[in-house]
Design a protein with these regions (language model features):
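Short, well-structured alpha-helical segments in soluble
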Residues: 107-120, 229-244
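Flexible loop/hinge segments that line or gate small-molecule binding clefts
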Residues: 104, 126-171, 191-192, 254, ...
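N-terminal helix-turn-helix/winged-helix DNA-binding helices
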Residues: 2-5, 45-78, 82-84, 93, ...
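Central regulatory/effector-binding core of bacterial HTH transcription factors
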Residues: 88-133
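Flexible loop/turn connectors
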Residues: 232-337
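N-terminal helix-turn-helix DNA-binding module of bacterial transcription factors
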Residues: 1-63
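Short beta-strand segments enriched in small/hydrophobic residues
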Residues: 17-22, 59-74, 175, 183-190
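Hinge/beta->alpha junction and helix N-cap segments in small-molecule ligand-binding domains
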Residues: 72-80, 100-108, 161-171, 187-234, ...
Length: 337
């Protein structure tokens, strides 16, 4: 079926294209056409099943009411939870959401940013890689509304939301130490990310304060690409070189979950280790009920991402060029066993 156009409606009613456009955009109050004619036009448009091109209309008005969301991984439970909250909050403000995945790849992330800009989304929410700093700087220079979360660039004038990474990590590791754990390994990934570096610093601080400087054999760096296989190799090495390991600190819930699978496959009891992790997944309740957790405030992170971005978008629309930065550091909820 051929799509009905403004021209078709104008022909059916016997008026100009401009009159139809005015009626469909509610401009009869401006005196361009009478209210009676506007009602007649809108009734005919409904009868003809007219569907407006909202994107084209948005472009004419300088807005699309679309927000771009770039995640490192759509399959990651944390990011999917964040996406759900952002979508709910965005809809409350009249926005649609366009979700993309970068897979933590610099080149892909840059392509996605450029694609979203070409679609003229009103703003972008992103959990960026550190390597994409140059592309983020371009957004800032263009005064493009953008908010980062989970990861950030401390030297850029940028709206961002993160958790208290170092403090939460410090408290988790200190709790393991207070429970008598003396050889605590750390499993981490992507050290180029500021958040991972901060979590490592929290671990290191707790160990050094307790007089237990970190031993190289207890440091497990898992490459993100093919992380399942890489994690197995890292655990093989730790258990071989540090057989007296009695605790694990995981900088992400994914590393913790994969470690639990490794223990299950190798018939290793989780009860012999003290374990702590940033964020949680429901599986922990079954596979590791004694896991100490710093739960990230998913709801608050998602809601504030939308709130800050919306304020930024509205400031731009009203040409309020006063540059303001909102850097939020949110506390985690500690669940210590």
């Amino acid at each position: 079926m051929q799509k009905v156009s403004i021209k078709d409606i104008a022909k059916a009613v016997g008026v100009s294209n401009g009159a139809v456009s005015a009626a469909l955009n509610g401009r009869e109050k401006d005196g361009y056409i009478s209210e009676a004619l506007a009602k007649t036009i809108r009734k005919k448009a409904h009868e003809m099943n007219y569907k407006p091109n909202n994107l084209a209309r948005g472009l004419r008005m300088g807005k699309t009411n679309i927000i771009g969301l770039i995640l490192p991984s759509i399959s990651d439970l944390f990011y999917s939870q964040i996406a759900r909250i952002i979508e709910i909050e965005a809809e409350k403000l009249g926005y649609s959401l366009m979700i993309c995945s970068s897979e933590s790849d610099k080149e892909k992330e840059e392509r996605v940013i450029r694609t979203l800009k070409s679609k003229q989304v009103d703003g972008i929410i992103i959990a960026p890689t550190k390597k994409s700093k140059a592309e983020i700087e371009i957004l800032i220079k263009e005064e493009y509304p953008v908010v980062t979360f989970d990861r950030f660039f401390p030297d850029l004038p940028l709206n961002s939301i993160i958790i208290d990474n170092e403090e939460s990590s410090y408290k988790l590791v200190r709790h393991l130490i207070n429970q008598g754990r003396k050889n605590i390994a750390i499993l981490t990934t992507n050290p180029h990310l500021t958040t991972m570096d901060m979590r490592f610093r929290g671990y290191k601080k707790a160990m050094e304060e307790a007089g237990m400087p970190m031993h190289p054999d207890l440091y497990g760096l898992v490459e993100y690409i093919n992380y399942e296989e890489n994690l197995c190799n890292v655990l093989d090495t730790i258990l071989k070189k540090a057989p007296d390991v009695d605790g694990f600190f995981f900088t992400t819930h994914i590393l913790a979950l994969e470690t639990l699978c490794y223990f299950s496959d190798h018939n290793i009891s989780v009860n012999q280790f003290g374990m702590a992790c940033i964020h949680e997944v429901p599986t922990f309740k079954v596979m590791a009920p004694t896991m100490h957790i710093a739960r990230m405030p998913v709801e608050d992170i998602g809601a504030n991402c939308v709130k800050i971005l919306h304020e930024n978008i509205e400031n731009n629309r009203h040409q309020e060029k006063k540059h303001w930065i909102n850097n939020m550091v949110m506390p985690c909820v500690l669940k210590l066993k």
